[in-house]
């Protein structure tokens, strides 16, 4: 039996996992995210429970099975694309660096700027922990400045939709006043008008590989941790 565990926060997810473990309802777990100081990953690791992480891991990489795409390279290539389109003031909007995929995409964005002789500016980066954070003032200040960015790289499609809606409130036209590039090529990227330009990070293949590795390690428990 396959079970999907969701929760409002780490505590809810951890509680559900602990309940499943107590009732011997799972042979392994797949975490669809990776972040610093994650209590869920720490619990699974400390209890010696089989788990596979989708994303680059923050702790105990040599003892952890994980599947990752190169988010830094994806961030760099996305920023390169905006540079090649003629943009020289490129900003970044993303979730907290605690989420490692966002930290890596931001790092790639900064690498691209440096490669093109542009010094990354921290004031051009707006980051949030959740959508409940007070990010609107920071975005408004950035996007209405006289020398405002002409393009913005966004860590994922959901935030890009939020940004596009916020630009509408400010009277900014996409892409005439601000070009946006995001990541994931999810359903969210196709419900906006205009549709988002988004980088496909192959989530289906990542999920398939994570499931394959989980089954492989269940059937062969003495296998060493795999990094893909």
Q: Would you name each region that the model predicts?
A:
Residues 1-7, 110-133:
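Short beta-strand elements in bilobed, periplasmic/extracellular small-molecule ligand-binding domains
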Residues 1, 74-77, 100-119, 162, ...:
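Short, solvent-exposed amphipathic alpha-helices that sit
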Residues 1-80, 143-144:
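Alpha-helical recognition/docking segments in bacterial nutrient-uptake
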Residues 88-89, 120-124, 174-179:
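Short acidic capping loops at alpha-helix termini that bridge into adjacent secondary structure
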């Amino acid at each position: 039996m396959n079970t999907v565990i969701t929760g409002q926060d780490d505590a809810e997810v951890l509680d559900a996992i602990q309940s499943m473990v107590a009732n011997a309802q799972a042979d392994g777990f797949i975490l669809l995210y990776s972040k610093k100081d994650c209590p869920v990953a720490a619990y699974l690791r400390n209890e010696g429970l089989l788990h596979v992480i989708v994303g680059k891991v923050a702790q105990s990489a040599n003892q952890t099975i994980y599947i990752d795409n190169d988010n830094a390279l994806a961030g760099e290539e996305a920023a390169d694309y905006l540079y090649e389109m003629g943009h020289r003031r490129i900003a970044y909007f993303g979730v907290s660096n605690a989420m490692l995929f966002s930290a890596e995409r931001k790092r790639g964005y900064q690498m691209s700027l440096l490669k093109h002789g542009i010094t990354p500016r921290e004031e051009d980066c707006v980051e949030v922990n959740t959508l409940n954070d007070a990010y609107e003032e920071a975005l408004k200040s950035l996007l209405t400045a006289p020398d405002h960015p002409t393009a913005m790289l966004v860590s994922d499609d959901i935030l890009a939709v939020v940004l596009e809606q916020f630009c509408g409130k400010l009277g900014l036209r996409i892409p005439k006043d601000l070009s946006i590039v995001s990541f994931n090529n999810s359903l969210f990227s196709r419900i906006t008008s205009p549709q988002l330009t988004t980088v496909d990070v192959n989530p289906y293949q990542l999920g398939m590989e994570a499931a394959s590795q989980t089954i492989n390690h269940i059937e062969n428990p003495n296998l060493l941790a795999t990094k893909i």
